[in-house]
Amino acid sequence: MNILILGSGGREHALAWATLQNPKCDKLIVAPGNAGIAQIADCASLDIMDGGTVVTFCEENSIDFVIVGPEAPLAAGVADDLRGAGFLVFGPSAAAAQLEASKAFTKEICDAANAPTAAYAHFTNHADARAYVEKQGAPIVIKADGLAAGKGVIIAMTDAEAVAAVDEMFEGAFGDAGAEVVIEEFMEGEEASFFVLCDGENVLPIGTAQDHKRVGDGDTGPNTGGMGAYSPAPVLTDAIAEKALNEIIRPTMAEMARRGTPYQGVLYAGLMIKDGQPRLVEYNVRFGDPECQVLMMRLGAQAFDLMHAAADGRLADTQVNWGDDHALTVVMAATGYPGSYEKGTVIKGLDTLPEDSKNMVFHAGTTLSDGAMTATGGRVLNVTARGDSLAEAQKRAYAMVDQIDWPEGFCRRDIGWRALD
């Protein structure tokens, strides 16, 4: 099969790495890709937000299957354009992608499906939202309604922070994403990610993970797109996962189908778990980044078969073969991230690292410049390892981190602490 993956981050590098292990993959193209992906697959310069351009590319390159990595092209309807042209595609329609693209839409679906989630209010008016947070008080959660690259959520621990967050959103800090705001109760507990594949009708759980949002050790500092992750997440026990499936995910999928917008692709449920009860924090309509990297490390070649079955409506007779293993990824970021950071710094030492089924460095923000690997993003590398235990995976990952010569980079040194302490 000729396969096209859309995207350019560490998530897409991990998807490409797993896909290439499957013998069904004859040719793999990633668009636009990055310097790390270019070492294992062909990369194409393509505007992945333009469905027509992507369709033409698929026709010209005899593509059999398209995997859409990021959320923005899904919300823009690229999967719809591809399906309309007769291509098999992994990723939801624009209508179904509203589960991530609009926080208010998700809340409405949860209400209809009776899925446990935080109490909330939805605002389009600045003064009303301000009055609401002043009345409710902190702690409270303020979310930009639209897509904000995973950064449009502010957990306000004081009344002043809450008011400032509302002001910031309505004053345009998150662009159009913050034109509408959802304000939620603050949920206590431990957060974990639950990943399922959906084919429009059936739901297949494919793994759990826990990421580390804060920039600093001990979960300190501002939120980021994620500084590391591990899988499985011990807090998401089989019993809690079953509860989440029956009380949250399956009712959501049934409600989406009832509305005529069946969901096809991966659904990532962010869950808050307290006293054995899961509640929905948010849905994402794509693999998490960096959670995808640890899931792919554990799934390997079968990941492609699972995605293909979801796209083809065959999940009813598909199963996941899990090993009793653990994976952990450490994000190396440019100093200054998530604020302003320097671009173009040189990374050395990558070519001495092992690359196999237990050790892999996935590239997130790199470019090859005059033969040198350079950092071009905030989150730059995902140093990923697999082991029989989480402690082994952690040790292996940090051993690789310590061999990377990049003075302008940094990472957290405690990824996995919740499960290991």
What residues fall within each predicted segment?
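Short acidic-hydrophobic, aromatic-tinged amphipathic segments that line or gate anion-handling sites
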Residues: 43-49, 121-125, 156
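A conserved helix-loop-beta module that forms one wall/lid of the active-site cleft
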Residues: 90-152
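ATP-binding N-terminal substructure of ATP-dependent carboxylate-amine bond-forming enzymes
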Residues: 1-94
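Generic C-terminus detector
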Residues: 366-370, 374-421
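Generic long, charged, amphipathic alpha-helical segments
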Residues: 343-382
